[in-house]
Amino acid sequence: MARTTPIELYRNIGIVAHVDAGKTTTTERILFYTGVNHKMGEVHDGAATMDWMAQEQERGITITSAATTAFWQGSTKQFAHKYRFNIIDTPGHVDFTIEVERSLRVLDGAVVVFSGADGVEPQSETVWRQANKYHVPRLAYINKMDRQGADFLRVVKQIDQRLGHHPVPIQLAIGSEENFMGQIDLVKMKAIYWNDADQGTSYREEEIPAELKALADEWRAHMIEAAAEANDELTMKFLDGEELSIEEIKAGLRQRTIANEIVPTILGSSFKNKGVPLMLDAVIDYLPAPSEIPAIRGTDPDDEEKHLERHADDKEPFSALAFKIATDPFVGTLTFARVYSGVLSSGNAVLNSVKGKKERIGRMVQMHANQRAEIKDVCAGDIAALIGMKDVTTGDTLCDMDKPIILERMDFPDPVISVAVEPKTKADQEKMGIALGKLAQEDPSFRVRTDEETGQTIISGMGELHLDIIVDRMRREFNVEANIGKPQVAYREKIRNTCEIEGRFVRQSGGRGQYGHCWIRFAPGDEGKEGLEFINEIVGGVVPREYIPAIQKGIEEQMKNGVLAGYPLINLKAAVFDGSYHDVDSNEMAYKIAASMATKQLSQKGGAVLLEPVMKVEVVTPEEYQGDILGDLSRRRGMIQDGDETPAGKVIRAEVPLGEMFGYATSMRSMTQGRASFSMEFTRYAEAPASIADGIVKKSRGE
């Protein structure tokens, strides 16, 4: 099969940002200018192509990352070939950070959208951290330059100070707010004015207005200096006082962007059709093709110590990462995969190396939001949806049967909030199980479990909005009506002291008995470790080796159920160092029970404490309500961190326990007459004060 587009002409990019910075509108404009859509969709009309779930159109926010393919040859057709863009539009709401995380994992570059009026917002920082984690080169696009309070250079300064990255403006604004006219292209040193008659598809170039010439010269000098640092050749030329050509400036900026040293910064107003075509040009000029990023690394499934690499090349063995599972009403399960190397044709068999299972590829489609075009092959650099996969979950590797590899997996955060759901009727009961199973397969940050004591179904997620959407989707997509309980906080338990505990389970009353006996030393685990670190210190066979795994299992099972108030015990070290056995009566079950009994005693002997999730909260409020907001956050046991000012008002940052934040949106609205906004995200677990912990422990014991 001949590749239709050379890999050098690919750009796999994500459009990422804070809620309401204008991501989806920007993506809609991209689809319009690249000719995929003949009519623009507006978010506030509920007609945006990329927002294809019913709830997205109603709420005006993007929840799932829709993937789409588009082609671009330049705003003035200046490139010799058409470039192929695979674009992923991601949600900006903090409850859906998981969608952003998994998109960034498979992208080669990102366009981070900021609002010219609001600047760097809390979610912008989260997205930026995620992009740093996966070393994603990026452009900054300062949108909404027509809005009141928009100030391009202020946002540039914030990117530098708050995000700690080196922004390099390659454009400047001509006018701002309602007088925003266009931009200055600092590379060509021309003023650009957009043509309203064709919805900003074309523009005219003029000389830079005299009053902006000095500013343009100053920022152009910064840009050239940034480009010249790319390599010795350009540096020498720059130091010798020679003029760098346009090609050299672009090459220098490109090299440093791909190395994640700088962020080229551009501007526009997507809604007013000013600037998006130049952003597409910048994606081609400065963001990498799949062949320009380092080879993807992985391990050999048979030998975890053996590191393997796959280069973005059709001749290499096939490897791909399944980064998203979606349920489609017509074809069933869609597995979105990013192909890193090799070629795959429909009908081929691949290995799911994480699960060790063979999968046959039925059909493959390329997605345009929720429209599908069937394709026969996918090559290195492609993003496509595979139909008919049975056992694939997010983060699994698909690879060549004969050349297995496990690509680096994605880390998903644990949920911080739970609610009980109950089906309204008997008919809903069965459907609810199926619906929740499918939704959990799609979204790794969403969990479902059954409470053993009450028999209730408990769903857990990243925030109230996250769970609202899940329940809403159950109703719409699976016709399941359910009642929702009050939100519950996902507490954790941890021990403070090191202690040695004897676990003894003996039942001997004639016939085959039970005999399990062990001594275990428990200690708090190392910082940053979540689970159990188990050490076998048995010498001389006082406990036979075959019973050691049963002891570990007994500890792990008790950790799941906790020792204090029924919440999972985390961050534990356990060393089994002594014990005894009986030739006839000892068995695995007896040792498992003995270890479990020893672990239970940690509530007293280990000084077990309750941990509560703490949220990073950021409130933006008009100045006159600042005192009320601060007082209210303090009453909620909040620790005020710092604050600053933006045109939107005062910004207050605090850390507040999640248990105190339920219903905060409503009380904040009434306190500020609906003029303040807030966002929060999980930051860490911290020890709950005794007064709170005692109440929770008593409640769990039914006192």
Curated annotation (Swiss-Prot):
Keywords: Cytoplasm, Elongation factor, GTP-binding, Nucleotide-binding, Protein biosynthesis. The keyword Protein biosynthesis applies. GO terms for biological process: ribosome disassembly. SUPFAM superfamilies: EF-G C-terminal domain-like (SSF54980), P-loop containing nucleoside triphosphate hydrolases (SSF52540), Ribosomal protein S5 domain 2-like (SSF54211), Translation proteins (SSF50447). GTP binds at residues 17-24, 89-93, 143-146. HAMAP family: EF_G_EF_2_B (MF_00054_B). Belongs to the TRAFAC class translation factor GTPase superfamily. Classic translation factor GTPase family. EF-G/EF-2 subfamily. This is Elongation factor G 2. It comes from Pseudomonas putida (strain ATCC 47054 / DSM 6125 / CFBP 8728 / NCIMB 11950 / KT2440). The lineage of its organism: Bacteria, Pseudomonadati, Pseudomonadota, Gammaproteobacteria, Pseudomonadales.
